[in-house]
Amino acid sequence: MKTVSIFGSTGAIGQMIIDVILASSDSYQVKALVAKSNVQLLAFQAKIVNAEMVVIADVGLYKELKDLLFGTNVKISVGDVGMQMAASLNVDYVMMAIVGIAALVPMVYLISAGVKVIALANKESVVCGGTLLFNLAREKNVNVIPVDSEHNAIFQILHSNDRENIDKITITGSGGALLYMDYDQMRNITVQETIKHPVWKMGKKISVDSATMVNKSLEIIEAYHLFSVKPEKLDVIIHPEAIVHGIVSYVDGACIAFMSVPDMKISIMYTLSWPNRMSMLYKKLNLASYHQLTFMKPDINKFPGIRLGFEILRTSNIHANSIIFNTANEIAVDAFLNRKIGFLDIVNVIYSTLDMVDCLHINSLSDILECDSIARRVASDIICKLN
């Protein structure tokens, strides 16, 4: 039986991880569940998977969580101390599903503790942690395996094939909820229309990122770090059916594509069984049911957010600009979800923040967090002026 801890268990991806574990309950023992503030769901999850330990990040919710778990043997911890305790547990797999840059510090704790495998469903920690994070992972001999479908696809292709003669790595994108909408129509698009993804079941933040196509820029930067590939070897193509998740092209003209139904549970299953595979628990791909598969170049005029990743990788300060980009996007998306700005304002806020913030040296975790703090303040000020 394999042991696993889940950071961010109450989020959209975290709940899918719980579903996969429950479907293979004889194969996994859950050591720890970590959540931000959803005590009701955290307590419920702890009971159904028989977790040994739970951590709630919000220290003010300790008593409520304690009451909910009264009569069980579940250990309860809170805040940063609890996060460090969970990170220090000896487990076979850690599933990192915390949303946003909030995952970065726990990632550092986990890698520093020398965990065996981190299945990473968080692109922001890679974008902001950059080379510092991966240098530490190499030093501690920690395997970081991406859960996001696109990077998981590329990881699986490269794991089984030649890594030396790559011509291009292509990340696919469904195009999000607004792919076929006219630019002018986007000015008055509602939050509900934006987060109604046509293919994937995702949380609100990533659904907005998909609609702006900023997620593809984040994924380009993520791929740059995950696969140690030169920026000019990275590409994006729009594929609305979301059947092909990634393509690796070689110098001899051969292309290897990874295909599956669009279900995050498939990549979750892979990371929970790596380097092996488990039997399929869900719907399998039936190509005959698809009359066609569509591929198209992204419209960078309609979706300027897709340019950001490539532009940042061409700058002299990739790490700092990646942090500023990610932070500005987090602030702008939150403002949009709270109806403080319009949809088209999101990318404008990002570009304005990049123009106004300059973090010169990123040499430590504290430098990353300081740069994030500055960008957070500037992006918030820009949004206030828009109102």
From Swiss-Prot:
1-deoxy-D-xylulose 5-phosphate binds at residues 123, 149-150, 174, 197, 210, 215-216, 219. One of its GO terms (molecular function) is NADPH binding. It is an enzyme of class 1 (oxidoreductase). GO terms for biological process: isopentenyl diphosphate biosynthetic process, methylerythritol 4-phosphate pathway involved in terpenoid biosynthetic process. NADPH binds at residues 10-11, 13, 38, 122, 124, 203. Keywords: Isoprene biosynthesis, Manganese, Metal-binding, NADP, Oxidoreductase. NCBIfam families: Dxr (TIGR00243). Catalyzes the NADPH-dependent rearrangement and reduction of 1-deoxy-D-xylulose-5-phosphate (DXP) to 2-C-methyl-D-erythritol 4-phosphate (MEP). Belongs to the DXR family. This is 1-deoxy-D-xylulose 5-phosphate reductoisomerase. The gene is dxr.
